[in-house]
């Protein structure tokens, strides 16, 4: 299965725990840190709960890019350029402009995702996600709201675990997803550079979202933060996942802080793995 990941016991977690804790703010906790070899799918480091599914939030854009390329909707990094219209999601200033695929990924533009999901439709989205092993592949949206194409991946029905995220990314970078090679290469090109550490060049996608309270409102003090992607050095590729959850409200998104924390931890992680 494309999204399959092979787990082996990781023996260094206790030794690294004290080192990694220093870079994580006291107001957030790591749910999972996961590193795996992209070619063999072997987990090299696993710490925390990496099996529970939560919303993918904007990390879903990577899978959506593969789907849209494969379906012929996305043609290149700059096609199609779609016009912004009043009424579209625009709570970030950079979203209020005509947007192409490169801008979509860089600025994490929700309304562009919504136009792509509408063009794909629920049936194709579900079929692709099932073939990718992408979480529960549930695009139904909020119960009774008929909004699956608009927000199923944002604190709604679509859920994925860190292990499943790693499996999807491993299949993507290893060229093993059941899509055209052009679709995989095009999607990878869109993913932004995440930083360089210890000679490793990281590329990944952040994601931020809030869990729901019992009354359906968002719990803005308990936001999730994702950073999901791959790292390259010489001829080797590793896939990584960092998932955090806040314990109080923050001005900076959880995804950006998860990215920065993983970058700060990367050198210690690589030393612990002997890489």
Show the residue positions of the predicted features.
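Bacterial N-terminal signal peptides that target proteins for export
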Residues: 1-14
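Structured C-terminal helix/loop/strand segments within mature extracytoplasmic catalytic/sensor domains
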Residues: 49-53, 119-121, 173-275
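Active-site SXXK
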Residues: 53-80, 104, 165, 240
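Short, well-structured active-site flanking segments
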Residues: 70-86, 179-184
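Mid-domain, small-residue-enriched loop/turn segments at the edges of structured enzyme/sensor domains
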Residues: 92-93, 97, 101, 117-173
């Amino acid at each position: 299965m494309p999204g399959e990941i092979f787990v082996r016991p990781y023996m260094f977690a206790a030794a690294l725990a004290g080192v990694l804790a220093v870079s994580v703010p006291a107001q957030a906790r790591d749910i999972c840190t996961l590193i795996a070899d992209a070619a063999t799918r072997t987990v090299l480091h696993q710490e925390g709960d990496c099996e529970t599914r939560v919303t993918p939030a904007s990390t879903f854009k990577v899978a959506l890019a593969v789907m849209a390329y494969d379906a012929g909707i996305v043609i290149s990094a700059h096609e199609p350029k779609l016009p912004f219209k009043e009424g579209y999601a625009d709570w970030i200033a950079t979203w209020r402009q005509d947007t192409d695929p490169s801008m979509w990924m860089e600025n994490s533009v929700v309304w562009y995702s919504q136009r792509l999901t509408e063009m794909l439709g629920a049936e194709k989205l579900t079929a692709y996600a099932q073939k990718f092993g992408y979480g529960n592949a549930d695009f139904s949206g909020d119960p009774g709201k008929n909004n699956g194409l608009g927000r199923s991946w944002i604190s709604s029905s679509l859920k994925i675990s860190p292990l499943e995220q790693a499996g999807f990314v491993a299949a993507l970078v290893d060229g093993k997803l059941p899509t055209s090679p052009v679709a995989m290469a095009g999607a990878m090109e869109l993913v932004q550079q995440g930083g360089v550490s210890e000679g490793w060049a990281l590329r990944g996608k952040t994601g931020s979202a809030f869990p729901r309270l019992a009354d359906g409102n968002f719990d803005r003090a308990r936001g999730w933060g994702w950073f999901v992607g791959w790292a390259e050095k010489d001829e080797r590729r590793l896939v990584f996942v960092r998932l955090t959850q806040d314990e109080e409200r923050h001005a900076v998104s959880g995804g950006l802080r998860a990215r920065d924390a993983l970058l700060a931890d990367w050198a210690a992680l690589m030393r612990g793995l002997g890489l």
